[in-house]
Amino acid sequence: MSERAPVVTIDGPSGAGKGTISQLLAERLGWKLLDSGAIYRVLALAAIHHNVELDNEDSLTLLAAHLDVQFITGNGSKGIKVVLEGEDVSNDIRSQECSNAASKVAAFPRVREALLRRQRAFSEAPGLIADGRDMGTVVFSKAPVKLYLTASAEERAQRRYNQLQDKGFDVNIDQLLTEIKERDDRDMNRSVAPLVPAEDALVIDTSQIGIEEVLNIALAHIETNLSGVS
């Protein structure tokens, strides 16, 4: 396939900083944003709202085909605004329950295929920042710029703990670490679109570096590989 606009893919495990960097890049460049992980969390939330079982691939696929989701940037420290059928669900989809459910529904091949078409439709001028787990390997495999962000499981658990605490959720960091390791194992070893860096992706370990440094590395890589982008 050929993309209709320049696409920068950002893949990696949960908590590596993909969401923050994707938002900052989209705002800095004035590009569209696709949060693939949020799409799966939105689908999981829609399934919960509509009483669809998380192991019912037929019903989940039908729900995915009609999923109405939008991403709105420019909200500053509040992050990306995620809208499902006209309702702001930005906080709802960040719960640990929804996060775990998203990983489960993402394991179904036909569900992924239904959402694949929707994700590719986000590629519009002037460009797209695509944040996910298989953006560079599957969804936008011909994207000119691919990044892969990673960090230790312990660092990612701490970040998730801080994030959920700030949002008022009562969480246990040891439980979070266990869930993150289990999710990594599921995502990296599933038969369909496992979580791995694309062969031509720039891998950035964010464990010991700050947001600004990661952003500068990403921008420099984009500018090097895409002419006319600054």
Swiss-Prot record:
It is found in: Cytoplasm. ATP binds at G12, P13, S14, G15, A16, G17, K18, G19, T20. InterPro entries: Cytidylate_kin, Cytidylate_kinase_dom, P-loop_NTPase. Its main location: cytoplasm. It comes from the Bacteria. One of its GO terms (biological process) is nucleobase-containing small molecule interconversion. GO terms for cellular component: cytosol. Its EC number is 2.7.4.25. The keyword Ribonucleoprotein does not apply. Keywords: ATP-binding, Cytoplasm, Kinase, Nucleotide-binding, Transferase. GO terms for molecular function: ATP binding; CMP kinase activity; dCMP kinase activity. Pfam families: Cytidylate_kin (PF02224). It catalyses: CMP + ATP = CDP + ADP; dCMP + ATP = dCDP + ADP. CDD domains: CMPK (cd02020). Belongs to the cytidylate kinase family. Type 1 subfamily. This is Cytidylate kinase. The lineage of its organism: Bacteria, Pseudomonadati, Pseudomonadota, Gammaproteobacteria, Alteromonadales.
